[in-house]
Amino acid sequence: MGLTAHDRQLINSTWGKLCAKTIGQEALGRLLWTYPWTQRYFSSFGNLNSADAVFHNEAVAAHGEKVVTSIGEAIKHMDDIKGYYAQLSKYHSETLHVDPLNFKRFGGCLSIALARHFHEEYTPELHAAYEHLFDAIADALGKGYH
């Protein structure tokens, strides 16, 4: 299912309340700790051997912030998310050889971080809107693999 007008309204009304560094660090940390095989893409980040090391790693925080900031920019291009991510998709597929399932995994980790941030405001309706967005982003980033 694509992004509806209501999804877009919900996303636009809540995204600006986030701190990209905090949410990004938590989401990427969750990805790296929950799916430890994803750490192979981040060997330059240093010690990722414990939860404490992952969740307090400055490189994880910086890259998480970069990813979440990119999603914020993609929100401004919801009519052409595939076009917005075309170059990044190509880079992830041809240069980094990232498993495209990791984009969906990151979306799941980001959903958990958003739920922790928004608490009661993270209704099933808001969750669904973000899931639609993250699915569209994962699809766009996976486009370079086709």
Curated annotation (Swiss-Prot):
UniProt-annotated binding residues for heme b: 63, 92
Highest taxon listed in the record's lineage: Eukaryota
Gene Ontology CC entries for this record: blood microparticle; haptoglobin-hemoglobin complex; hemoglobin complex
Biological process, per Gene Ontology: hydrogen peroxide catabolic process
UniProt note on tissues of expression: Red blood cells.
Domain Globin, first and last residues per copy: 2-146
Signal peptide as annotated in the record: none
One MF annotation (Gene Ontology) recorded for this entry: oxygen carrier activity
CDD domains recorded: Hb-beta-like
SUPFAM superfamilies, per the entry: Globin-like
Keywords noted in UniProt: Heme, Iron, Metal-binding, Oxygen transport, Transport
Free-text function comment from the UniProt entry: Involved in oxygen transport from the lung to the various peripheral tissues.
Record note on quaternary structure: Heterotetramer of two alpha chains and two beta chains.
Family per similarity comment: Belongs to the globin family.
Official protein name in the record: Hemoglobin subunit beta-1
Gene behind the chain: hbb1
